[in-house]
Amino acid sequence: MKKALALILALALSLSLFGCSPAEAPEDSPNAGGDGTQAAVGAFVGNESDEYYMVSFLSGIDYWKHCFEGMEDAGNALGVTTKYTGQTDSDVAGQVAVLEQVIAQSPKGIAVTCVNSTALADTINAAKEQGISVVCFDSDSPTSDRSSYLSTGNSEAGRIAAEYLVPLCGGEGKIAVLYTVGAENSESRVQGFEAWCAENAPGIEIVKVNDAGDTTAATDNMSAALQANDDLVGLFCMDGIAGTAGPTAVAESGKDLRVLAFDVDTTVLDKVKNGEIDATVAQGMYNMGFWSMMFLYTEANGLSAKALPQNVDTGVTIVTKENVDEYYPK
């Protein structure tokens, strides 16, 4: 029932955002009359033979399952067919090959998350030249001709994380941030976290710790930070690796810290559920998939009087013991 209501609201929002052209029905059309809403709604009834693909790298991980759930729900409600495929690792050439295979199927639209920001541009452009609608989600190809990019606003996510964690820590003291130094998404989260603290909690001192993109290195580096900073009161683990390594280092140290993770890997969700960490930040994975499908359908069927939004922030949610069960993959 919630998802049905969500779709109705999404449809209403789509109509208002895009000014769907089917509302301009001829006067003698059976759908004419009123404000044209009936005609516009009818345009959002698709054909089961129309196929829309989601393409990822590291296929099969929980993160993409949440994304595809959103796309699948939107596709089912619209009456079209949705399919998921992807490269099993982070090999760039491999994802290009998978995307080329999907294009060969001549789908109506493709939602793709890009393992590399530039390497898929030519392939995406080739799809567009064939009349296939393409949007990017989670990881962009900004130099390509993709129609829209749906992702987490990482700076805002960092601010939301600080707003949750800092009060748990009493509003002052040292908080460690464990993240991949140099990674654009993590750096933006740090920036947002720091900005919120500077504005709202000047008594917070931030200790930066590099997880180096490796679980072992992250655990070792966090352990060293705990030894060097005996007065740490909190820890924000800003990516999936940090979410595993950070709590491990804290547990091994025997110290009592308030801990906030990022993302909803099953391991992290289990830590929230058993009380090992306070909470985690869930990206809007379902929203990425849901709105990717809505955008693709809108463009592929010529329903928009306006260009799709170039960038869409799909939001984040704080996941605690109270709502953690909702985030396990189905």
Label each PLM-derived region with a short phrase.
Residues 8-16:
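Bacterial N-terminal signal peptides
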